[in-house]
């Protein structure tokens, strides 16, 4: 394999320089070289060769206790730092990490985990089924790189998983003499700076990127090494003391498809407050938007946008003819009204946001979790506050922004792991130069999938879910029900409570005791309703009686924007050879069908489904999957457009002498 020796962090803030292309031909040439480099990386059958080496090294370590592991770690670290990471030295490191896991955690890595770790150490995405122990797998490349002297970031989707994984794995790292800490968004800046000094840092993607943007603000886009070294020699409170990160050396991205693809549709923006008395304008915009009629605009739910018609523009010109600025400025007037219409029609309470303690809090659509320090721009956040009758916060002004695509390409080495990467293999390779390797399961899956059930209305769907839960609860089967929004989870909870069924709710508003709730979700007869919070990284342990009753039964109540998210929820069941069942109970009123309302097939399909002839439910299930696939294609186009815009911006900045 390519040695890591060239990646040693000699610079004060090591990271990969951005690729800048003078023209499309140069960009095409770079893409071809990337493709060839991915093809040169080892396929799985060749990757298996390391297993023999690891087992041979492990036999030599079998008698070591924790003190012996610690002493051997110093020897391995010296070799790695002198010679770089080669296949032979990596095998020795893996065997040592495996022995540390056995002694400190009571867990020795399986062969499939060794394969996954080796793939990631080479800069690949390891596709491992849910329940195969990705958290333990990540310790192999993380510890090996850290022993080699590289700062390591283990990145996952939320603070709950960050803290959980770091705490569980810390005894293993400490046995090797490595420091490990985690970073969460609610930590004070001084705490985060200290945490980033550790050998291995667990953090969420959002917290990490925002801290990187804060570093860019401190550096003011000036990363001149000589100047930074001079500042360090002078001592005192220079820029280096204000930085959070130690550069971008090696990242292991858990749930890589979610972080690198699903969440990569919009740039991350760090902003500052801007004192402005905009309450009057905000109220006027909402009042004017409410007065507009349907013919003045078109709502496009699938694209999450509103467009003005010519009739709408004419209405605004006439309504605002005598109004002062900003209403007298056409582009600003339309911008305000489009924001107001978007707030009225596309931002719904308990879906996109919740209200807590008199404040609007954004709900992450991918994780289902509250993001208390985040806000929407372009006046949208203030309009939502006005709509909810709350005190208006100060508008925000952009200080720095970056896309996930551009950020992660700055790492000297990038790797990832997920249970659902096959569908986006091409995108991961094209955008991040990340090959995907499929890792086999440790035990055969025993999960059973029932055919989809489709009902005409939402009410009929909830009724069917209620009856299914009643039947499963009577048999002692634990049930996990997935919903797409807080509102849907609360509505279903009321339906089940009215039927005297015991229900536990886990969503952005009910997240105080998440760990204990999840720990009880695998008990006999339990019923948990959850948003995406229980969809990724969540291990629901089964009691012996629940396993005997048939294992966890997962019910999907809506198709998500991506089939991968559905598969993640299904993956909570049947883990590590446990029994389990999954099924989808859906309706023709589900939000996913918004994407096909205006398609050529919408009319004929609606007619066929309304007739409810023989086989209509199977046809409806196919129509729902088609709508989901259509949404996936639309989102992929949006991401491609964003990458293109990013590249154009990068190239234009290179000619103007700017850029990160």
From Swiss-Prot:
Do you know which Gene3D superfamilies this protein is assigned to?
P-loop containing nucleotide triphosphate hydrolases, SecA, preprotein cross-linking domain
One GO term under biological process is: intracellular protein transmembrane transport
Q: Which domain of life is it from?
A: Bacteria
Whether Cytoplasm counts among this entry's keywords is yes
Q: Which InterPro entries match?
A: Helicase_ATP-bd, Helicase_C-like, P-loop_NTPase, SecA, SecA_CS, SecA_DEAD, SecA_motor_DEAD, SecA_preprotein_X-link_dom
Q: Which reaction does it catalyse?
A: ATP + H2O + cellular proteinSide 1 = ADP + phosphate + cellular proteinSide 2
Q: What keywords is this UniProt entry annotated with? A: ATP-binding, Cell inner membrane, Cell membrane, Cytoplasm, Membrane, Nucleotide-binding, Protein transport, Translocase, Translocation, Transport
**According to its record, how does it sit in the membrane?**
Peripheral membrane protein
Q: Which residues form a coiled coil?
A: none
Kindly list the places in or outside the cell where this protein is found, as annotated in its UniProt entry.
Cell inner membrane; Cytoplasm
Q: Which cysteines are joined by disulfide bonds?
A: none
Enzyme kind, highest EC tier: translocase
Identify one Gene Ontology CC term for this UniProt entry: cytosol
- One GO MF term attached to the UniProt entry: protein-exporting ATPase activity
Q: Which Pfam families match?
A: P-loop_SecA, SecA_DEAD, SecA_PP_bind
Which EC number(s) does the record attach to this protein? 7.4.2.8
UniProt binding sites for ATP = 113, 131-135, 539
Q: Where are the transmembrane segments?
A: none
Quaternary structure, from the entry: Monomer and homodimer. Part of the essential Sec protein translocation apparatus which comprises SecA, SecYEG and auxiliary proteins SecDF-YajC and YidC.
> In which family does this protein belong, per the annotation?
Belongs to the SecA family.
State its role.
Part of the Sec protein translocase complex. Interacts with the SecYEG preprotein conducting channel. Has a central role in coupling the hydrolysis of ATP to the transfer of proteins into and across the cell membrane, serving both as a receptor for the preprotein-SecB complex and as an ATP-driven molecular motor driving the stepwise translocation of polypeptide chains across the membrane.
Name of the protein in its database record: Protein translocase subunit SecA 2
- Origin species, per record, is Bordetella avium (strain 197N)
């Amino acid at each position: 394999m390519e040695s890591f020796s060239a990646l040693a962090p000699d610079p004060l803030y090591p990271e990969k320089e951005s690729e800048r292309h003078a023209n499309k031909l140069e960009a095409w040439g770079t893409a071809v070289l990337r493709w060839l480099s991915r093809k040169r990386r080892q396929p799985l059958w060749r990757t298996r060769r390391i297993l023999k080496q690891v087992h041979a090294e492990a036999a030599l370590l079998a008698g070591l206790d924790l003190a012996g592991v610690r002493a051997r770690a110093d020897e391995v670290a010296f070799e790695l730092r002198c010679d770089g990471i080669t296949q032979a030295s990596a095998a020795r490191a893996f065997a040592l990490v495996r022995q540390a896991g056995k002694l400190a955690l009571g867990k020795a890595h399986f062969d499939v985990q060794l394969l996954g770790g080796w793939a990631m150490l080479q800069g690949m995405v390891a596709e491992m089924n849910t329940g195969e122990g990705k958290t333990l797998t990540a310790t192999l490349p993380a510890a090996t790189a850290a022993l080699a002297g590289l700062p390591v970031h283990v990145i996952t989707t939320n603070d709950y998983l960050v803290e959980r994984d770091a705490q569980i794995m810390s005894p293993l790292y400490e046995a090797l003499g490595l420091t490990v800490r985690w970073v969460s968004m609610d930590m004070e800046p001084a705490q985060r700076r200290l945490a980033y000094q550790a050998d291995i840092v667990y953090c969420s993607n959002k917290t990490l990127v925002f801290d990187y943007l804060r570093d860019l603000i401190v550096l003011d886009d000036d990363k001149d090494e000589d100047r930074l070294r001079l500042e360090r020699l002078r001592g005192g409170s220079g820029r280096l003391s204000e930085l959070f990160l130690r550069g971008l050396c090696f990242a292991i991205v858990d749930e890589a498809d979610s972080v690198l693809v699903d969440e990569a549709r919009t740039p991350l923006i760090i902003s500052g407050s801007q004192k402005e008395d905009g309450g009057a304008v905000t109220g006027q915009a909402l009042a004017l938007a409410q007065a507009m009629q349907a013919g003045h605009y078109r709502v496009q739910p699938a694209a999450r946008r509103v467009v003005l018609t010519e009739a709408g523009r004419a209405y605004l010109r006439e309504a605002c003819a005598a109004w002062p600025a900003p209403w007298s400025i056409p582009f600003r007037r339309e911008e305000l009204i489009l924001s107001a219409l978007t707030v009225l029609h596309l931002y719904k309470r308990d879906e996109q946001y919740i209200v807590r303690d008199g404040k609007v809090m954004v709900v992450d659509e991918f994780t289902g979790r509250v993001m208390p320090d985040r806000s929407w721009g372009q006046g949208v956040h203030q309009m939502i506050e006005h709509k909810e009758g709350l005190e208006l916060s100060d508008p925000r002004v952009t200080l720095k922004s970056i896309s996930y695509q551009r950020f992660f390409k700055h790492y000297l080495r990038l790797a990832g792991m997920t249970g659902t990467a096959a569908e986006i293999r091409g995108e991961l390779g094209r955008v991040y130069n990340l090959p995907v390797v499929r890792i086999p399961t440790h035990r055969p899956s025993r999960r059973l999938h029932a055919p989809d059930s489709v009902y005409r209305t939402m009410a009929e769907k909830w009724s069917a879910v209620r009856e299914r839960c009643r039947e499963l609860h009577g048999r002692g089967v634990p049930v996990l029900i997935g919903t797409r929004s807080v509102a849907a989870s609360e509505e279903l909870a009321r339906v089940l409570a009215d039927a005297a069924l015991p229900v536990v709710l886990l969503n952005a508003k009910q997240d105080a005791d998440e760990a204990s709730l999840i720990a009880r979700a695998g008990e006999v007869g339990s019923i948990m309703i959850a948003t995406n919070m229980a969809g990724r990284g969540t291990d629901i342990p089964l009691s012996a009686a629940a396993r005997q009753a048939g294992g966890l039964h997962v019910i999907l109540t809506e198709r998500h924007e991506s089939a991968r998210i559905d598969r993640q929820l299904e993956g909570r069941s049947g883990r590590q050879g446990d029994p389990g069942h999954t099924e989808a109970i859906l309706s023709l009123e589900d939000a996913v069908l918004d994407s096909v309302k205006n398609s050529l097939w919408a009319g004929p399909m609606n007619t066929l489904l309304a007739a409810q002839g023989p086989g209509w439910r199977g046809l409806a299930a196919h129509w729902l999957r088609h709508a989901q696939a259509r949404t996936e294609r639309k989102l992929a186009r949006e991401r491609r457009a964003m990458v293109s815009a990013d590249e154009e911006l990068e190239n234009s900045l290179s000619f103007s002498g700017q850029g990160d």
